[in-house]
Amino acid sequence: MSTSSSDPFFNFTKSSFRSAAAQKASATSLPPLPGPDKKVPGMDIKYDVVIVGSGPIGCTYARELVEAGYKVAMFDIGEIDSGLKIGAHKKNTVEYQKNIDKFVNVIQGQLMSVSVPVNTLVIDTLSPTSWQASSFFVRNGSNPEQDPLRNLSGQAVTRVVGGMSTHWTCATPRFDREQRPLLVKDDQDADDAEWDRLYTKAESYFKTGTDQFKESIRHNLVLNKLAEEYKGQRDFQQIPLAATRRSPTFVEWSSANTVFDLQNRPNTDAPNERFNLFPAVACERVVRNTSNSEIESLHIHDLISGDRFEIKADVFVLTAGAVHNAQLLVNSGFGQLGRPDPANPPQLLPSLGSYITEQSLVFCQTVMSTELIDSVKSDMIIRGNPGDLGYSVTYTPGAETNKHPDWWNEKVKNHMMQHQEDPLPIPFEDPEPQVTTLFQPSHPWHTQIHRDAFSYGAVQQSIDSRLIVDWRFFGRTEPKEENKLWFSDKITDTYNMPQPTFDFRFPAGRTSKEAEDMMTDMCVMSAKIGGFLPGSLPQFMEPGLVLHLGGTHRMGFDEQEDKCCVNTDSRVFGFKNLFLGGCGNIPTAYGANPTLTAMSLAIKSCEYIKNNFTPSPFTDQAE
């Protein structure tokens, strides 16, 4: 923490000091829930199922189990900030769909960095009367134990009800065989069938489709050009998207709310269902029984009142994300608190936080070529000049010589006539491109060729965004034991939980070679659409910026042989009633967006729960 050997903090990280959070990591001394006359509104003495986290995976568990008759409570550290529909996508507003670049600020405002190395910059211009630290500060996300050379510097979390689904891209591709974990051993056909069954159901929950942008001029412009350039070599299609087109100018993007309406139940629409959502509640630990065979309760901290309670349930499901699932487990006595010590492995879940993966990411932006833009109006018959009295734009509907369908030509004609001041023939409200060539063994990376909002890549107002195409290629990373996520026994995060720390490097060999090949592929492909936008030349982005962290609590068939934490039903090994959901379960090297796969695993997990746990009887009394 300090660079000076004379400073009292110089050897702090090697000291025997343990933070208050670390000292309480296995504490079980919380008071019981308050009685029915004093309980938090909606909070019951005992639930059938408790779910931690309200993102799409938590909502998958909620939907499956609430509809099956279970009494379910869901706790989330974040608050409701998405409007009338709890956990809805914030891009579902006309303002952002008219100007996607404005949504970048929404994303940036939602993301909280996981681990930030301390800033070693010394401010030596302070007044002599001002207090000056002799060591580095530990607030504002700073982590003195984070090696900046082994960090996932772009890794961040979203703490709101609905999680990252309130601002995600909604890309929901299926994994192919190379990316998927096995669910059925020694029978590839049966495994394929099982994944197809689960994927189909997950897609129905998310409303995944591949035709929402079929009548976008820009989309077809990019799609057709790439299909022509790579004919016989690569297949191009729309990105599979969790979204529903409501009109030619408005798309409803799916989110946690799409999967499950987070309104409390019973209610008018669901009089026979039982569900309660508790926002702004930090879940601090699960309490194990004396034989380490099941979980007895969950300790929660109401962040508004400051009160702490113990929640009882038959089943406990953690879906708080790849970082916070592991954090909660470590704070409960699983894995190892503090810097990993290979000579002293933990007894419970020794692989927790090991073999983590995160995708490499290359990015650039191009400005569409003159050739492409001119081709937009290739079927138009233009007379005169814009603004002239005799100016007209027409086309011949249904003509065999037309290069574009009538819907395309009608849009172009109307725009060129109604907006003669616009030098571009593309309508102002033309939907953005959403193109991909999917992950394949010959090019093992996922591609998103589109125009969307991320925490980076906003376009200057001096450039018309209709001309811009974003290129994001995602590479897979081989799981390696030395790549770890661990939690400090000395430093705590903003919520007084053990501070997450990364020990990660992209592995040499296949992972690194594929990343270079992916960069070359993006450069060559993007040049076929146009020239690079100044300031957005091809580049590798910060590790972790993809936000697809995986493998923190890996899935497998055997805990020891597969170095994993949960089985294929997402149940923690050795515990009959503790389940983990999310991308942290995925143990493989994957390049595609993992959310649909994580949801599929959650559906399978729910099937196990329904087969092994019985819902409590429903009563007519208010629950």
UniProtKB/Swiss-Prot annotation:
The record's free-text note on cofactor binding: Binds 1 FAD covalently per subunit.
Residues at which substrate binds: Q448, H450
UniProt keyword Methyltransferase present: no
Gene Ontology cellular component annotations, sorted alphabetically: periplasmic space
Predominant subcellular localization, coarse grouping: periplasm
GO molecular function terms noted in the UniProt entry: flavin adenine dinucleotide binding; pyranose oxidase activity
pH dependence, entry free text: Optimum pH is about 6.5. Active from pH 5 to 9. Stable from pH 3 to 11.
Subunit and partners: Homotetramer.
Protein name: Pyranose 2-oxidase
